[in-house]
């Protein structure tokens, strides 16, 4: 009789361990728990306000960095196009000089 009681206790202990492993330990998300449970911002209060302020500060800084990068990109584009315009104007002037020389040689003939 004692052996069967011991076997029953052992089975119950093993089953309890399996149940705990299946359910999980700690604050892992389960079916009935929201994924944001325990989030500081959702809790409200001073910590929630602080978290919100830090997030807003982060995103403002990120937007400022992106705008600075975009401004630099546009300045580089403008510089490139200005150089290209200058190069093409020189090319036009060179062609005009060629035409002028051809006209002069034609008039000399």
Swiss-Prot record:
Q: Which residues form a coiled coil?
A: 69-109
* UniProt region (Disordered), positions on chain: 26-52
Q: Which GO terms describe its biological process?
A: erythrocyte differentiation; heme biosynthetic process; negative regulation of endothelial cell proliferation; negative regulation of hydrolase activity; negative regulation of mitochondrial ATP synthesis coupled proton transport; protein homotetramerization
Transit peptide, UniProt annotation: 1-25
The annotated consequence of residue 51 to A reads: Retains its inhibitory activity at pH 8.2 although it still forms a homotetramer at high pH
Is Membrane among the key words of this record? no
What are this entry's molecular-function GO terms?
angiostatin binding; ATPase binding; ATPase inhibitor activity; calmodulin binding; identical protein binding; protein homodimerization activity; structural molecule activity
> Which residues are annotated as modified residue N6-succinyllysine in the UniProt record?
103
Q: What is the effect of changing residue 52 to A?
A: Impairs F(1)F(o)-ATP synthase-binding
Q: Where would you find this protein in the cell?
A: Mitochondrion
Site: Participates in pH sensing. Where?
Answer: 51, 74
Q: Which domain of life is it from?
A: Eukaryota
**Outcome of mutating residue 58 to A:** Strongly impairs F(1)F(o)-ATP synthase-binding
Q: In the UniProt record, which is one GO cellular component term?
A: cell surface
Region Antiparallel alpha-helical coiled coil region: start-end pairs: 74-106
* Effect of mutating residue 59 to A: Strongly impairs F(1)F(o)-ATP synthase-binding
Under the heading Gene3D superfamilies, the entry gives: Single helix bin
Sorted alphabetically, which keywords does the UniProt record give?
Coiled coil, Mitochondrion, Transit peptide
Similarity section: Belongs to the ATPase inhibitor family.
> What's the domain remark here?
Forms an alpha-helical dimer with monomers associated via an antiparallel alpha-helical coiled coil composed of residues 74-106, leaving each N-terminal inhibitory region (residues 26-62) accessible for interaction with an F1 catalytic domain. The inhibitory N-terminal region (residues 26-62) binds the alpha(ADP-bound)-beta(ADP-bound) (ATP5F1A-ATP5F1B) interface of F1-ATPase, and also contact the central gamma subunit (ATP5F1C).
* Entries under PANTHER family matching the protein: ATP SYNTHASE F1 SUBUNIT EPSILON (PTHR48417:SF1)
Its biological purpose is as follows:
Endogenous F(1)F(o)-ATPase inhibitor limiting ATP depletion when the mitochondrial membrane potential falls below a threshold and the F(1)F(o)-ATP synthase starts hydrolyzing ATP to pump protons out of the mitochondrial matrix. Required to avoid the consumption of cellular ATP when the F(1)F(o)-ATP synthase enzyme acts as an ATP hydrolase. Indirectly acts as a regulator of heme synthesis in erythroid tissues: regulates heme synthesis by modulating the mitochondrial pH and redox potential, allowing FECH to efficiently catalyze the incorporation of iron into protoporphyrin IX to produce heme.
Q: How does it assemble?
A: Homodimer; represents the active form and is present at a pH value below 6.5. Homotetramer; represents the inactive form and is present at a pH value above 7.0.
Supply the name of the protein. Answer: ATPase inhibitor, mitochondrial
Q: Which gene encodes it?
A: ATP5IF1
């Amino acid at each position: 009789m004692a052996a069967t009681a011991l076997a029953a206790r052992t089975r119950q202990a093993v089953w309890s361990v399996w149940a705990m492993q299946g359910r999980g330990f700690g604050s892992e998300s389960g079916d009935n728990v929201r994924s944001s449970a325990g989030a500081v911002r959702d809790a409200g209060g001073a910590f929630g306000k602080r978290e919100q302020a830090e997030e807003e500060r982060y995103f403002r800084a990120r937007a400022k960095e992106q705008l600075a990068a975009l401004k630099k990109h546009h300045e580089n584009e403008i510089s490139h196009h200005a150089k290209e315009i200058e190069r093409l104007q020189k090319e036009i002037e060179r062609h005009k000089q060629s035409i002028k020389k051809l006209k002069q040689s034609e008039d000399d003939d």
